[in-house]
């Protein structure tokens, strides 16, 4: 036995003997007047003073109140629910987005739902009640079952009444006011069950899709497979809009728009398929040619006065600011300016997807970018009530 090891053992014995002879006690009242019993009680530990620090309390999105939305808190009303969708088994490249909801929440620790969003010129909680419902349990061995779990959970939240009823006629088909859902993904496949939910409440919606890829690819039969002739590739994060179009979930007459497109195509005909699905395209290069104001003009002219769903794939951002496979992307400042230009649109729901913390930098720049974008989405929802 080395001298260092022997010294360490003797040191531990001394510490243990001292602690047994001098047990730690917390005095009720110190000479300074501090009440330690109260200080370490539930009364103080769970007060706002402690929980609002970025390093304290539960890690909900931007310190939103946590709710058991599918359990004991099912009767609590709110205007916007943050919902996690930990799913990544329909990705075509690197998995890891199942950890995205937690990563985005971690990136939001310095934000707060009750803080003033200076660029958006609003304090969201002065207009809407925001809660965090946690994550939907999504099985990781069966795509269909997992997406069905999300669809049912999303529909259950949307069916409830919102906590505020603005003046005017509701956009919803039943004439009632319903909460909105901000979903944290998860690979982009999750947008399909989310669109099913909002379309069930509002009818077809115009989609503003921020992404480097079209995600409207037609599923192709596996003609080259001798074992699966004629079998079709199932729903993935690259073709969910094709299925959304087939199901009648998207706004008609090309009232949907992609923003930030720059990824490679499989064939030139992909553009024709995309137009058939119902999208207008704004490429990433448009930011250089017509600026963010020109892109905003394109978006507003495309979606008109329709109910709008915003879906943002984090790879729309340049990889220098949010590491992802496609170079030449939009900056976070340009995204924020575009969002400012969307004020007044009737946002019925939104998602931020494809955040994979395992591929982020040590500084968590992707998670921080995604969290701030989601925070701006809340501001957009707070700015405009869903009235006709």
Region locations from a protein language model:
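Fungal secretory targeting signals
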Residues: 1-21
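Conserved alpha-helical scaffold segments that buttress catalytic/binding sites
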Residues: 22-388
């Amino acid at each position: 036995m080395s001298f260092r090891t022997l010294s360490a053992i003797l040191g531990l014995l001394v510490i243990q003997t001292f602690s047994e002879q001098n047990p730690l006690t917390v005095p009720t009242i110190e000479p300074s007047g501090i009440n330690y019993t109260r200080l370490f009680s539930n009364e103080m530990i769970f007060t706002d003073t402690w929980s609002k620090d970025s390093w304290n309390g539960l890690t909900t999105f931007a310190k939103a109140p946590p709710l058991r939305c599918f359990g004991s808190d099912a009767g609590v009303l709110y205007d916007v629910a943050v919902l996690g969708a930990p799913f990544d088994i329909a990705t075509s490249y690197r998995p890891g987005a199942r950890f995205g909801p937690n990563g985005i929440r971690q990136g939001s620790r310095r934000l707060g739902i009750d803080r003033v969003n200076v660029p958006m010129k609003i304090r969201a909680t002065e207009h809407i009640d925001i809660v965090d419902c946690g994550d939907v349990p999504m099985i990781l061995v069966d795509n269909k079952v997992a997406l069905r779990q999300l669809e049912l959970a999303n529909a259950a939240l949307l069916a409830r009444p919102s906590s505020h009823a603005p003046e005017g006629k509701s956009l919803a088909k039943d004439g009632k006011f319903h909460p909105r859902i901000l979903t944290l993904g998860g690979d982009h496949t999750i947008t399909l069950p989310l669109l099913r939910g909002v379309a069930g409440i509002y009818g077809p919606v115009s989609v503003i899709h921020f992404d480097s890829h079209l995600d409207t690819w037609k599923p192709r039969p596996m003609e080259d497979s001798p074992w699966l002739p004629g079998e079709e590739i199932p729903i993935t994060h690259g073709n969910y809009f094709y299925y959304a179009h087939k199901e009648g979930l998207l706004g008609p007459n090309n009232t949907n728009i992609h923003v930030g497109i720059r990824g490679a195509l499989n064939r030139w005909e992909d553009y024709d398929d995309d137009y058939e699905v119902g999208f207008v395209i704004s490429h990433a290069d448009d930011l250089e040619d017509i600026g963010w104001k020109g892109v905003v003009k394109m978006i507003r002219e495309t979606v008109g006065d329709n109910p709008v769903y915003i879906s943002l794939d984090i790879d729309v951002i340049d990889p220098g600011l949010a590491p992802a496979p496609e170079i030449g992307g939009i900056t976070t400042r340009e995204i924020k300016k575009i969002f400012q230009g969307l004020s007044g649109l009737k946002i019925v729901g939104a998602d931020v997807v494809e955040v994979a913390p395992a591929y982020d930098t040590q500084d968590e720049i992707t998670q921080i970018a995604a969290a701030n974008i989601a925070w701006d989405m809340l501001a957009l929802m707070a700015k405009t009530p869903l009235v006709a």
